[in-house]
Amino acid sequence: MMDAGRADQAARARALNVWRRMGYRIAPGDSFSYILHLRPAEWPIMAAHTALGTLLAVGLSPGAIAETAGDALLGIALWVLCLNGGTLALNSAYDRDAGDIGYLEAPPPPPRHLAAFALTLMAVGQVGALLLPPLFALDYAACFVLSVLYSVPPLRLKAVAGADWLINMWGFGTLTPLAGWALTGRPLEPWALLVMFAFCPLFAALYPLTQLYQYEEDRCRGDRTLALVLGMRRSLLAALLATLAAFALFFLAAAVGAAGWRWPLLALPLAAWLAVLVPWLRNHETMQPAQHQRGMYAALRAWAVTDLAVLAVFAL
């Protein structure tokens, strides 16, 4: 039988809004919970960051985009839905969070077979990746392994401060746009490598920000997340320093590549990041979890501005 806390969690998840109520009415049994734990709210963010790599490779010319559209659309779907969605669902299966989590407000209790579902979905994506350029398939396989190491006991590197940070900064920050570039089959250029490396410290900045609003819940569960080990102030300082390192690499890439007069556009996302991080650092001691959560989403908007600026500088 379902205990009272789990029953309350399930009721809130099902009644949160009209879309939830409609989904649970249409989908049989608990099957809509499987979809929710793929966290569709993150799909546009992941798709955009993967597509960034593709557009950096081919440019913004409609003709060049059309040449690689077939492989790009299939590869992005596999990366976003199978790999990233499966990773997040696998994470949910072992975290068993009761409160809000990244990209999923009022999560339903993890269904019984969520872990098996997630692993199967990621494996299906790996088979599909073999139909695409070899570098993409290799990139997918590397992230598949990292996802399992990150989420699944006994290793569960998510709960090991520092290891969780490294996996995410490389997996989302660098390997995701690399996957998009790999879908085109084009050789990597030096400036492109610098851009992809720049996204590594930029995600290093974002990652602890995603943990601050779950600070107390992670502490109660016994996880040693990066934010818990560093503390809030040092987490925010680390985010600020990592952001500055990322933009130093972006500016270096602009100097190496053919950015021309467009390189000053990189100052816009830098200003957006500083507008999020500096007030957060100044006010963190008095902020509530909901305010930390809003800060995380503000940082995600700064990330989106960064992607757009990078495209404007390097792909036009």
Task: Give the ranges of each region predicted by the language model.
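Short, Lys/Arg-rich, polar N-terminal cytosolic tail immediately upstream
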Residues: 2-35
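Extended hydrophobic alpha-helices typical of membrane-associated regions
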Residues: 20, 28, 32, 129, ...
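Intramembrane alpha-helical segments
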Residues: 35-36, 105-187, 191
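Small-residue-rich segments of transmembrane alpha-helices in multi-pass membrane proteins
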Residues: 47-53, 165-181, 227-235, 293-310
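Membrane-embedded alpha-helical segments that form the functional core of polytopic membrane enzymes
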Residues: 47-90, 137-148, 188-209
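Acidic (Asp/Glu-rich) catalytic motifs at the cytosolic membrane interface
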Residues: 79-105, 205-227
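C-terminal ends of transmembrane helices
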Residues: 88-97, 101, 146-161, 207, ...
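Multi-pass membrane catalytic core of lipid/isoprenoid biosynthesis enzymes
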Residues: 92, 96-141, 224-258
